[in-house]
Amino acid sequence: MFIDSAKFTVISGKGGQGCASFRREKFVVQGGPDGGDGGKGGNVYFLVDNNTDTLSSYKGRKLFKAENGKQGMGGNMTGKSGDSLVLVVPPGTQVIDDETNEVLFDLLENGEKILFLEGGKGGLGNVHFKNSRNQRPTYFQPGLPGSTKNIRLELKLIADVGLVGYPNVGKSTLISVTSNATPEIANYEFTTLTPKLGVVEVGNYNSFVMADIPGIIDGASDGKGLGLEFLKHIERTKTLLFVIDVANYRTMIDQYQVLKEEVAKFSNELSKRNYAIALSKIDGYYGENLEEDIKNFIKELDLEESNSNEFKFETEYPYFVQDTIYSRFDKSKPYFVLPISSLTKYNIKQLEFALYELLGQDK
């Protein structure tokens, strides 16, 4: 099960209390104090592990607590420190103070380990309180309490390419034919109820991560449909691929404009990311002239049909691609507008190489 948020209380361990004891040895009358200190309470850490991609291990749990330190012992022996608690989270997890909404940590890198709460110090044993006036002190200190924090975890997926489109436009099919992801695929809206990640292999040595984000509808940025719950997952994507369904009752330009608007309303920064456009389901087109419809869409974007073919695009239908060999990459325009079919694999390999090249434009 994909869980992208969790709320619970975290407590570090309490320090163990000090010990009040006295030396008891043969021929030693009224031995001096030898009570040891209490052990330190366990710390709480966060550890980022890219072998997990969900917060499901925290589902239904309200409290996580590190172990308390053990009591000190005679013979000036310090009590055992409490075991630390390590909370394992996937990359992209934010740790948020549930009372103030302050983002405490943004955990991105695999292997990153953060000390979150330190355990309480152990109390001092009576050996520390001997003085000239009191040779046999019975006083010892209790351990200090651990720290308590009410937190919220929120997972925002990290991907190189995020698929943005209406429900049922072919995003799940596209990620299934380009990567190792196995999303549910069916002919109804909101098949994808949780984000899916897939690794796209480009040639023998290169790859990138693609995210299938649940479909966006009009008003998604206001919380309609699956709304803000899933729009947040494209916040961390480096590049956006707008997937436009040519077999949809909505026109291509209408789909594109709504998607761009919803992304911009959700995050102005996100709307400035590099992007490209895939015209999907050309195998299911039922209009009069797909070639003319694609040409008109390219014109409506104030672009011109391309003749250059660096990526060896199929040429049955028109396409657009920025010529970065003789001119600079223009972030305000799509890197390419490409008709594809996940069913027949039309332009699929070319799409993978073009996306990989687009990811390199920011390097």
From Swiss-Prot:
The record's listing under CDD domains reads: Obg (cd01898)
Q: What is the protein name given in its UniProt record?
A: GTPase Obg
Which cellular compartments is it found in?
Cytoplasm
The entry lists its GO molecular-function terms as: GTP binding; GTPase activity; magnesium ion binding
Segments forming domain OBG-type G: 159-360
According to its UniProt entry, the protein's GO biological process terms are:
ribosome biogenesis
Keyword Cytoplasm among record annotations: yes
Query: What EC number(s) does its UniProt record assign?
Result: 3.6.5.-
**Binding of Mg(2+): at which residues?**
172, 192
Pfam families noted in UniProt: GTP1_OBG, MMR_HSR1
Keywords assigned by UniProt? Cytoplasm, GTP-binding, Hydrolase, Magnesium, Metal-binding, Nucleotide-binding
Q: Which Gene3D superfamilies match?
A: GTP1/OBG domain, P-loop containing nucleotide triphosphate hydrolases
Q: Could you say which residues bind GTP here?
A: 165-172, 190-194, 212-215, 280-283, 341-343
* Protein origin, superkingdom: Bacteria
